């Protein structure tokens, strides 16, 4: 176990919540001068922390506990009928891991995704600097999983490979391929890859009951939620 007591953390001032517009949010960050050590990262992921760019963070709101860390235990997961259909529908998609990088191919896909799927969000409008700062980090455990259909890039799953599982950082995909449900397929693939690697779980970030955009996470069962400082299994 890493000696977490020696680590420093900093809390932000209250700011508008990205998920619940009526709420003010506070975020707890690991000291940015602390090297991004994979063992520290893995241990903090067990406590609900996530990575964004070069920072590890988790919600630290005083009056709200709506953001609940969620993970899928890979060894226990069984796809339901709809998920099996998604897997079948995408059998012709190949997946390859590469190191994070900025390419025009990646950025073009990212722009199309943000403009068509998240034009109402705080990541709009997309920019090259935003893409690089958020996703293209030179970290030894970070991967871009390329999803290709007959050689054509249709999705990227930005994923951190940790000793305790895969952390699904961000996924973006071709909005023209809506029939394929590529976002859901990426999660199903990550669950399968976690099992193939003999790791524990896929860390999906935060589930928020009253946020419609987060509802998809509880479609993967069983799921574990981090509540009252412990992981609780829901079947």
Swiss-Prot record:
<keyword id="KW-0808">Transferase</keyword>
<keyword id="KW-0963">Cytoplasm</keyword>
<protein>
    <recommendedName>
        <fullName>Aspartate/glutamate leucyltransferase</fullName>
        <ecNumber>2.3.2.29</ecNumber>
    </recommendedName>
</protein>
<dbReference type="GO" id="GO:0005737">
    <property type="term" value="C:cytoplasm"/>
</dbReference>
<dbReference type="Pfam" id="PF04376">
    <property type="entry name" value="ATE_N"/>
</dbReference>
<dbReference type="InterPro" id="IPR030700">
    <property type="entry name" value="N-end_Aminoacyl_Trfase"/>
</dbReference>
<dbReference type="GO" id="GO:0008914">
    <property type="term" value="F:leucyl-tRNA--protein transferase activity"/>
</dbReference>
<dbReference type="Pfam" id="PF04377">
    <property type="entry name" value="ATE_C"/>
</dbReference>
<comment type="function">
    <text>Functions in the N-end rule pathway of protein degradation where it conjugates Leu from its aminoacyl-tRNA to the N-termini of proteins containing an N-terminal aspartate or glutamate.</text>
</comment>
<dbReference type="InterPro" id="IPR016181">
    <property type="entry name" value="Acyl_CoA_acyltransferase"/>
</dbReference>
<keyword id="KW-0012">Acyltransferase</keyword>
<dbReference type="InterPro" id="IPR007471">
    <property type="entry name" value="N-end_Aminoacyl_Trfase_N"/>
</dbReference>
<dbReference type="GO" id="GO:0004057">
    <property type="term" value="F:arginyl-tRNA--protein transferase activity"/>
</dbReference>
<dbReference type="GO" id="GO:0071596">
    <property type="term" value="P:ubiquitin-dependent protein catabolic process via the N-end rule pathway"/>
</dbReference>
<dbReference type="InterPro" id="IPR007472">
    <property type="entry name" value="N-end_Aminoacyl_Trfase_C"/>
</dbReference>
<dbReference type="InterPro" id="IPR017138">
    <property type="entry name" value="Asp_Glu_LeuTrfase"/>
</dbReference>
<comment type="similarity">
    <text>Belongs to the R-transferase family. Bpt subfamily.</text>
</comment>
């Amino acid at each position: 176990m890493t000696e977490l007591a020696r680590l420093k953390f900093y809390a932000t001032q209250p700011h508008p919540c990205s998920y619940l517009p009526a709420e003010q949010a506070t975020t707890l960050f690991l000291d940015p001068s602390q090297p991004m050590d994979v063992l520290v990262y893995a241990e903090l992921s067990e406590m609900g922390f996530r990575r964004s760019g070069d920072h590890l963070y988790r919600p630290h709101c005083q009056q709200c506990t709506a953001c609940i860390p969620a993970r899928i235990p890979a060894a226990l997961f069984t796809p339901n009928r709809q998920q099996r259909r998604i897997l079948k529908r995408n059998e012709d998609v190949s997946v390859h891991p590469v190191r994070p990088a900025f390419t025009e191919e990646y950025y073009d896909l990212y722009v199309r995704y943000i403009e068509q799927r998240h034009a109402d969000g705080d990541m709009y409008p997309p920019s090259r600097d935003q893409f690089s700062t958020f996703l293209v980090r030179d970290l030894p455990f970070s991967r871009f999983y390329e999803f290709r259909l007959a050689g054509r890039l249709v999705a990227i799953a930005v994923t951190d490979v940790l000793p305790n599982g895969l952390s699904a950082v961000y996924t973006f995909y071709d909005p023209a391929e809506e029939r394929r449900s590529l976002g859901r397929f990426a999660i199903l693939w990550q669950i399968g890859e976690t099992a193939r690697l003999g790791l524990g779980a896929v860390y999906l970030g935060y589930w928020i009951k009253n946020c419609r955009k987060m509802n998809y996470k509880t479609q993967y069962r069983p799921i574990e939620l981090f509540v009252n400082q412990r992981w609780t299994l829901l079947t």
